[in-house]
Amino acid sequence: FSYKDRVDNLRMLGIVCKLLLKHNIISVISAINPFESIRQELAAYSPKVKTVWVRCGMETLIKRDTKGLYKKALLPDGNPDKVYQFTGVSDLYEIPKNPDLILDTDKETPDESVKKLTDFILSSINNPVDIQ
């Protein structure tokens, strides 16, 4: 995907969530958002917008990659199987500057990460902020 494709998709997801929020519907976007500027743009919609960084080392990502996309992205240029514009390898991924929650998925068990995320969401719901 191009930069524009990624930004357009993230903005569209943000707009949908903003509309749902006006009706007090909680939304969770599970999307790769590699750009700090777009994270900040989405956060400006409401103080209820939160960033969760699902942090994972490259070695673990490669081990978990059932489609082999990371291995293909790491192939030398010119290789017919190489995947180009792959986020975090050959395309930009900016580490979140101030995530509201970090899930260290290469250090935590899936159950630990789920509990942290669930507790975080429930805490956010139980401590509401006025919609601005």
Describe the function of each predicted region.
Residues 17, 117, 121:
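Hydrophobic "lid"/C-terminal helical patch
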Residues 34-37, 60, 108:
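Short alpha-helical
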Residues 9, 27-28, 50, 54-56, ...:
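Functionally constrained cores in energy, signaling, and assembly domains
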Residues 55, 63-116, 124-132:
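Small-molecule kinase domains that catalyze NTP-dependent phosphoryl transfer to phosphate-bearing small molecules
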